[in-house]
Every structure is written in C-alpha cells, then in structure tokens.
Amino acid sequence: MPSEKKNSNSGPRSHGSGNFRRTQFKRIGKSVIIEPGVLVFHPENIVLGSNVYIGHYAILKGYHRGQMKIGDGTWIGQQCFFHSAGNLIIGKYVGIGPGVKIITSFHAEEGIAKPILKSRIEFAPV
C-alpha cells in the first residue's frame, strides 16, 4: 500500500467549512438530492451519479488526490461519513444506512514509543 508521511513540524490545519456548490463537483448526475446539513470537502474530486440521495448531516470528505464515486440510484443515510483519501467507489443502487463510516486511510501502528498521530498514514481503495 502506498503511504504518506505528514510533516511532523506541521500543526493542525483547517479543511475548510464543507460548504459547497453543485457546480464544484467533478460530475453530478440528474435528480440528485442533497439534504440540508450535508458537508462536502474537495467536491472537485467527487462524482455523483443520477438519482443519488444524500441524507441530512452526511459528510463527504473528498481528498486532494483521491477520488470518490457514488453510482446511480444510491441512497446514503443521515450522518454518514465517507473519506476518500485512498479512493472510494460505491456502485449503483446501493443502500447505505444512517451513521455508516467508510474511511480509506489509517495511521499505521509503529510501536508504543511513537504516538499514533506521528505514525505514517496508509491508503487503500474501497
């Protein structure tokens, strides 16, 4: 798996507000419903098929180099969290219940002496 190491001298940084416009998506199909309270980060790397439903307060966390693709007719429940650092592809006509989290990266365990947030980050597609 490819890995990326964060500069240990960098501190916390904001990813932005999550506010978006439909025109910012890489591609968005017809009849897409995005309920109030949904946050979207890096919409330029997100493709939404036609007839997609995204429930209230879901978070689509695109990534500057990863891609997120959500297929036609897919239903995403309220308060879901999707992170696409390692690429995330959800097929057509998939139902995802409320509160589901799909994360495509993790901090590798490097021993008790190294804090987890200082360990390397690994990515994998889902």
Which ranges hold each PLM region?
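Extended, small-residue-rich solenoid/repeat segments and analogous flexible loops
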Residues: M1-N45
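Flexible, glycine/small-residue-enriched loop-and-beta-strand segment within the central core
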Residues: G37-L48, Y53-V126
